[in-house]
Amino acid sequence: MEKIGVLLMNLGGPERITDVGPFLYNLFSDPEIIRLPVPAFQKPLAWLISTLRSTTSQQAYLSIGGGSPIRRITEQQARELQSKLRDKGLNVTTYIAMRYWHPFTESAIADMKADGIDQIVVLPLYPHFSISTSGSSFRELKKLRDSDSDFKKIPMRCVRSWFSQSGYLKSMVELISEQISLCESPADAHIFFTAHGVPKSYVEEAGDPYKEQIEDCSLLIINELEKYLGHSNSYTLSYQSRVGPVEWLKPYTEEVLTDLGKAKVNDLIVVPISFVGEHIETLQEIDIEYKEIAEKAGIVNFRRVKALNTHPTFIEGLSDLVVSSLNGPVVNIEKASELPEKVKLYPQEKWQWGWNNSSEVWNGRVAMIVFLILFIELISGSGPLHKLGIL
């Protein structure tokens, strides 16, 4: 029987406090996370940002137990998906490829080759495609595949995005309805979708379909929820987790929470729409930071919907995605990672000197100024970073 490998791609996260700095360095070294007009500045800037943010990030991870649970949860998802697919008669082994922390993609590739896998299905654990999530993972996989003749011989099928898949929608509805049922007046509960944000330029300049897919997904869930409950609920979509001075997708989660408080919303059902497992953005950012903002704004009941994790309906939905990929037309790695032809993948390639409104140009200028300041301080041995104890 053909040996099938299912490669689950995810972000990764630091498992111990000492991992936080290196994890952040890997994250910000990715040009899809911070895109600069001068590639040579990428790693120095990544080092600087990871150094400056490390202490704050460590405190955030300490507040949720000292590390990210994303690897443990992804491994659980992989085991249950493997079991489900084997129950369906498929000779499947699941593998995990994390983008920014262990186990890295290289490790998964080595394991698949050692196991003699005959065909690979690549399934990103991101329902919605974005340059900075699935896109980055697909391009990393493509780079490694192109440099490995043996790996390149193994047939590969990719699932690009799956936010409209019935099992995913059903599992979201089931988890949301659990929280709505706790409300004194379920029909009056306000559904609050919060998705991980991306810089606005990714959508407007690079053609990232993420915003459109998030909006479509929110509406699909609301429609399915109404059928399931027999009544409609008002809803709002916002974006969280922005970093840096550039403009990200709006509205921002913290601002919307304040507005909902002013609107006298009592029962708020918070739905982390772009996260399929618990990690720092759900356990710390939503459960601690945003809950505090909501309570200060006057929201009485802040009910956060659990992440999908290993919810049975969700695992069933993932297995259906794999089966559909195997039985449907081949989507290769080139097709999975491409963007619309009318746009360029890296808008910063258009960068020119001169003042304009492009946030990515501002990113580049800021990076160059910061790098120059850092270089001078390293040479001189004195400056603000030394006074702060960072250098």
From Swiss-Prot:
Catalyzes the ferrous insertion into protoporphyrin IX. Its main location: cytoplasm. This is Ferrochelatase. It is found in: Cytoplasm. One of its GO terms (biological process) is heme biosynthetic process. It is an enzyme of class 4 (lyase). Pathway: Porphyrin-containing compound metabolism; protoheme biosynthesis; protoheme from protoporphyrin-IX: step 1/1. SUPFAM superfamilies: Chelatase, Chlorophyll a-b binding protein. The gene is hemH. It comes from Prochlorococcus marinus (strain MIT 9515). Fe cation binds at H196, E281. Keywords: Cytoplasm, Heme biosynthesis, Iron, Lyase, Metal-binding, Porphyrin biosynthesis. Its EC number is 4.98.1.1. The keyword Metal-binding applies. It catalyses: heme b + 2 H(+) = protoporphyrin IX + Fe(2+). Belongs to the ferrochelatase family. InterPro entries: Ferrochelatase, Ferrochelatase_AS, Ferrochelatase_C, Ferrochelatase_N. GO terms for molecular function: ferrochelatase activity; metal ion binding. It comes from the Bacteria. GO terms for cellular component: cytoplasm.
